[in-house]
Amino acid sequence: MRITKIFKDYRLFEIFILGIVSGMPLVIIFSTLAVWLKESGIDIAVITTFAVARLSYSLKVFWSPLVDNFKIPFLSRWGHRKSWLILCSSLMALVLIAMSKENPEVSLTSFYFLTILLGFLSSTFDIAVDALRIDKFDQETQSIASATAVFGYRIGMLITGAGALYLAEITGNNWQLTFCVIAIIFVVATIFIITVNEKELVREKINIISITSWISTVINPFKDFFKREFAVTILLAVIFFKLGDAMLGAVASPFYIELGYTKGEIAIIAKLYGLIATLVGGFVGGIVMYRVGNFKGLIITGIAQSLTHFAFIWLNHQPPSFEALLIAITIENFAAAMGATALVGYIGNLCNKKYSATQYALLSSASSLCNNTVTIYAGKLVNMMGWDGFFLFTIILALPALFILMYLNTKVNV
């Protein structure tokens, strides 16, 4: 297929828009909500417990067969994948409207429930979007579709990251209005989803046999992985590799607010410019892995991403300035993206090609599940250690992974 014909394909526009919608809730849960809570006077130890809402992204593999096979009454006439997208998108709009009506200072329990529900709906939406993309495109155009979806996803993250912070800033900290605007975007998205074309496929009905088969598809890749020598040690390296970065990420936005940075400055530097630093770092990380190999690449990027946390200790002792935040964000995002790229490549090489998709999902889910669980306690550690002590602790957290990788380098050929 000619490249010009590919980019004239309307299906790519559909996937791009769905990618935007898919990326929007993630940043609300991971970052934007933390700024609102911090400005409302909520303690950092409480704010980081909202990380429990992220667990849905790690656990979604367990209910993805339901999204594949269960027909939603009434909505399924629009199309099987679309029915799940319509349901999740419309419910996310309602959740965001409900959040806009709440005051976190007086209704924190409601905020917990709504945030967890948003995470569940968002992760389920992701399952349906990925499935729809795979259904709509053949093998020749699948990579273009995936790249388009990722690009849309990044745009969605900017809308609810930089966009939401900037809107809250110019409206005088009117978070209620900000969340209402985001909810309206989801309403418009729901209407758009109805117009999306879906290729209907014959689907297997859920029964005892299919449930047993589903259990086997999850268990067998696990069994295959743990048959290998040093399997548990490898898994520990994967889990610890990004743990320090995950801990830092959980408190970054409240940290900027506490230092005296405005939401507009955070939007422009941490979110908008930070994305550029992340993309460049990811590209460099890929080159490093290609040049020096998996183990050496992981060790190099692992050391780099942990040492860059010293930039936050330095930032903690600087008066709020555009330049200081720019330097810290450049160093941290660049190195973190290098590490993330290296980890993705390493996990990919660990997978048995017979179970590549499932083992990759399970290994990455194990890493994110542990990280998201531990980050719940990040705020308590900040209160106990102070900011400098906490950032030093995140550097130390990288050491187990580095020592394990150095040990494995002499034992395992990956």
UniProtKB/Swiss-Prot annotation:
CDD domains: MFS_AmpG_like. GO terms for molecular function: transmembrane transporter activity. InterPro entries: AmpG_permease/AT-1, MFS, MFS_dom, MFS_trans_sf. Pfam families: MFS_1. Coiled coil: none annotated. It comes from the Bacteria. It is found in: Cell inner membrane. The chain crosses the membrane at residues 15-35, 44-63, 84-104, 109-129, 150-170, 177-197, 230-250, 268-288, 295-315, 324-344, 360-379, 389-409. GO terms for cellular component: plasma membrane. Keywords: Cell inner membrane, Cell membrane, Membrane, Transmembrane, Transmembrane helix, Transport. The keyword Transport applies. It is a multi-pass membrane protein. Belongs to the major facilitator superfamily. This is Putative transporter AmpG 4. It comes from Rickettsia conorii (strain ATCC VR-613 / Malish 7).
